[in-house]
Amino acid sequence: MQKLIILLLVAAVLMSTQALFQEKRPMKKIDFLSKGKTDAEKQQKRSCSDDWQYCESPTDCCSWDCDVVCSG
């Protein structure tokens, strides 16, 4: 009976450590992907034509002026 309890405890520890490692892996991927260019650097490469372009934030516009559509 004691051997069974020890075996179950070891299995529980192994499963919990595996779960911890799996939680940390996506965070590393996110950190790797987020170390890209800044918004300003990304905008320099795309064509800056804000004519009637829908936006959600100022970073979506070349003019950095967003009010449902880019203006400026």
UniProtKB/Swiss-Prot annotation:
The keyword Cell wall biogenesis/degradation does not apply. One of its GO terms (cellular component) is extracellular region. Disulfide bonds join 48-62, 55-66, 61-70. It is found in: Secreted. Residues 20-44 form a propeptide. It holds the Pfam family Conotoxin. Its main location: secreted. Keywords: Amidation, Bromination, Cleavage on pair of basic residues, Disulfide bond, Gamma-carboxyglutamic acid, Hydroxylation, Knottin, Neurotoxin, Secreted, Signal, Toxin. Brominated at one of the Trp residues. Residues 1-19 form the signal peptide. One of its GO terms (molecular function) is toxin activity. The modification 4-hydroxyproline is found at residue 58. Belongs to the conotoxin O2 superfamily. This is Conotoxin Gla(2)-TxVI/A. It comes from Conus textile. The lineage of its organism: Eukaryota, Metazoa, Spiralia, Lophotrochozoa, Mollusca.
